[in-house]
Regions:
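Feature captures the catalytic cores and cofactor-binding loops of soluble hydro-lyases/lyases
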Residues: 333-334
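SAM/dcSAM-binding transferase cores
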Residues: 266, 509-572
């Protein structure tokens, strides 16, 4: 008696635990896979945003960080997708999917803390580490999507539905990461725990897949157990993450960290020499990226970590860059405020843009009858230097003074919308090392500032080091002139910043008239550094320096050449 051939339906059946997939139970698997893709997109973007923020602190806030993180990840995603055409991926399985998810989760969880630690122990390694981790994340994401599409194909999904099911959750997860990262996760959890959370969520879904579909696994006990072990280790890592990040962060600072705050806008760190710091801290002469060479002179970048010492040294760092040191901040703020104010007849209203540490406000409040309006983007900065007695004493309690009005918001938006007029506008912004801060030194910004000036009003701004960033310094000068200001450039020697520059502009007074008034400058209030001779020296420059600006571009907000000029340093 001859047997009839098996039907196609029976031929497609797979033995239990074979690792192969079939249409049976497809609906719950599809749902879990869609959730996994959502969290995978969330995890990958969280990882890259965390690395991008870390790169701002370790490498400096430049647009190149987008290439080092997002750019490399997208490129590696393409490589990962291409790899799935290899014969190794011919027969996909749930185990393969779980393995990729676990690898992505672990890499995300340890990426920030691991790079931060290694960069502290191995100065100069940060860029290499970030260039390595970012594409690895992209490679795993690139592997994951084609694997899921093949799994869905085995489950019998049509191509159109398959593509929609795979791509839509991934993109939705990416959007959720972008929205939640800046305004919720980063301020609440900090950089290390945000990356850890992204990896943990992805790992939980991998565990859910392993439990729900053990029948499809070749190793139905070992795989869920392995994911469980990873979850236990992840829990321990999350518990110790704040201590681990604090230890890693201290490696990057000579002095002990007195306060560290993460905000939606920046990482704020305040150090105090009297606190125990990093005993293995390397002086700038021994470490750091070489920026330029001139004969036997070597200029190195040390992320704003300078080796100057004084009896009491409290320093503010934003995203790893030094903003001030109590060794010499009085020189900076006295030169920023007093010469410009001396050019105004009977000043009454002063606007300070930036300067949330209150040190420029402190200098202004030395004058009787002045009302000061401070506009600062980061409210946490204001709270720190107004409410914490350790730091409020540095500005003499200026931010709590009744003569000071504080607005937390964007400076450009404020200038666009305000109808108030000010006798003096003081701009105390961070350096324009990226497009976000470079817009604050653009022609359009200076025009808005000029519109907010009262007749005869004066505008003063810091403008980087004329020694280390000469073309950027000259670009700010030319940009102010293009915005309709006559400009006098000032300079001051410092311990921490070596040599710093400022621009003072007026639409009513000529450059010669302002120079004549500065020549006769006498401090009207007590100062620590500034006197008549210091101001007389501050506005005098060599003929060669100021005339060497012919090929320096104006910083228009649509081209923004200033970040590139800032990075040129001593190329001349």
């Amino acid at each position: 008696m001859t047997r009839s051939p098996p039907s196609r339906r029976s031929a497609r059946r797979r033995p239990r635990g074979s690792g192969r997939l079939g249409p049976a139970g497809a609906a719950p698997l599809v749902t879990v896979v869609a959730l996994s893709l959502f969290l995978s997109g969330f995890c990958s973007i969280i990882s890259e945003l965390s690395l991008f923020n870390l790169a701002e602190g370790l490498l400096g806030g430049t647009n190149a960080n987008l290439t080092y993180t997002m750019g490399l990840m997208m490129f590696a995603m393409g490589l990962g997708s291409a790899f799935t055409a290899h014969r190794w991926f011919r027969n996909v399985s749930v185990e393969m999917f779980i393995g990729v998810e676990c690898a992505l989760s672990v890499l995300t969880m340890i990426s920030v803390a691991g790079i931060y630690l290694l960069a502290g122990w191995l100065p100069g390694s940060a860029a290499i580490l970030i260039w390595t981790v970012s594409p690895l994340v992209g490679l795993l994401v690139g592997l994951e999507i084609p694997i899921v599409m093949r799994i869905n194909e085995v489950l019998g999904l049509r191509l159109r539905l398959n593509v929609a099911l795979v791509m839509a959750p991934d993109y939705f997860g990416a959007l959720a990461a972008f929205v939640l990262f800046t305004f919720l996760l980063l301020p609440w959890l900090g950089l290390g725990r945000v990356a850890w959370l992204g990896g943990l969520l992805n790992l939980l879904v991998a565990g859910l897949v392993a439990l729900m579909f053990r029948a499809h696994l070749r190793h139905p006990l070992a795989v869920p157990a392995g994911v469980g072990v990873l979850l236990v280790l992840a829990g321990g890592l999350g518990w110790r993450m704040p201590d681990l990040m604090a230890f890693a962060e201290q490696l990057h600072y000579r002095d002990g960290i007195a306060q560290a705050r993460e905000t939606p806008y920046q990482r704020i760190v305040v150090t105090d020499r009297r606190r125990k710091g990093n005993p293995a801290y390397r002086a700038p002469a021994l470490s750091g990226k070489v920026l330029a060479r001139r004969g036997s002179i070597v200029l190195r970048e040390i992320r704003g970590r300078h080796a100057a010492y004084c009896a009491e040294d409290i320093r503010l760092f934003i995203n790893g860059g030094l903003q001030f040191s109590t060794c010499d901040e009085h020189r900076y703020h006295e030169m920023l405020v007093h010469p410009a104010l001396s050019l105004v007849e009977n000043p009454r209203q002063v606007l300070v843009l930036g300067g949330g540490d209150g040190l420029a406000v402190r200098e202004l409040l030395k004058y009787e009858g002045l009302a000061v309006h401070l506009v600062e983007l980061d409210g946490v900065m204001v709270e720190l230097f107004r409410d914490d007695p350790r730091f409020a004493r540095l500005n003499g309690g200026a931010l709590a003074d009744s003569r000071v009005e504080i607005t937390v918001g964007d400076a450009l938006r404020f200038l666009r919308e305000t109808r108030r007029r000010y006798d003096l506008i003081v701009m105390d912004f961070p350096d324009p090392h990226q497009t976000g801060t470079a817009r604050l030194y653009s022609t359009q910004f200076f025009r808005f500032a000029g519109r907010a000036l009262a007749p005869g009003g004066v505008l003063a701004t810091q403008s980087m080091s004329p020694l280390f960033h000469p073309r950027a310094f000259l670009s700010v000068r030319k940009t102010m002139r293009a915005a309709g200001f006559q400009v006098v450039s000032l300079q001051v020697p410092m311990l921490t910043f070596e040599h710093w520059g400022f621009q003072v502009g007026s639409r009513r007074q000529s450059e010669g008239e302002m120079q004549a008034r500065l020549e006769a400058f006498r401090p009207a209030v007590p100062t620590r550094y500034l006197n008549r001779e210091a101001v007389q020296a501050a506005w005098r420059w060599s003929k060669e320096f100021l005339l060497d600006a012919a090929d320096v571009p104006i910083n228009d907000q649509f081209t923004l050449p200033l970040p590139g000029l800032y990075r040129e340093t001593l190329r001349r």
